[in-house]
Design a protein with these regions (language model features):
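Post-transcriptional modification and biogenesis factors for structured RNAs
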Residues: 1-170
Length: 170
């Protein structure tokens, strides 16, 4: 299911945020709002752990749903087929196990920021996918397992947007 045509949504987003099998509706709702505010496109790879019409998704996204580009994909493979295979975009897989910090990357228009499900992160199969350009991490203090999905996506998206010069921002 692709998003409807809306003149408020950028035709060529500066980056694509891809959630693989998200399970917490509030995180997806928050990220819809964040993507609406930055011009990034959100892609959700199923199966989703919630109904997309869930009241928590709607509440977290407030009235930004019509201002965001959101595309639902059957699974991660279908999403990567569209974005990486057909679109030719680079894919950065965010994982706590990578050595490279996400700020060490020079982002390019159309890059894909790939995040795993909330309880476990990206599966090894996703990390090993040949379409993944590089695995990257958001630095944290020692002994911390992970960040909240919506927060991690926001941190990464704003870095990519900053590097792009905040196109369209006021």
């Amino acid at each position: 299911v692709s998003d409807a045509v809306n003149s408020a949504i950028p035709v060529n987003p500066f980056c694509h945020v891809l959630f693989d099998q998200p399970v917490i509706p509030g995180n997806t709702g928050n990220t819809i709002r964040q993507c609406a505010g930055t011009g990034a496109a959100l892609h959700l790879a199923g199966p989703l752990g919630f109904n997309f019409d869930d009241k928590h998704v709607k509440r977290a996204g407030l009235d930004y749903h019509d201002l965001a580009s959101v595309t639902l994909h059957e699974n991660r493979d279908a999403a990567l087929a569209e974005l990486a295979d057909e679109g030719g975009h680079r894919v950065f897989a965010f994982t706590a196990h990578a050595d490279t910090w996400f700020t060490d990357i020079t982002y390019e228009p159309g890059d894909v920021l790939l995040f795993g499900t909330e309880p476990t992160g990206l599966e090894q199969e996703a990390l090993d996918d040949p379409r993944v350009t590089q695995q990257v991490r958001i630095p944290m203090l020692p002994g911390r397992r992970s960040m909240n999905l919506a927060n991690a996506a926001a941190v990464a998206t704003y870095e990519a947007w900053r590097q792009a010069g905040f196109p369209g921002a006021v």
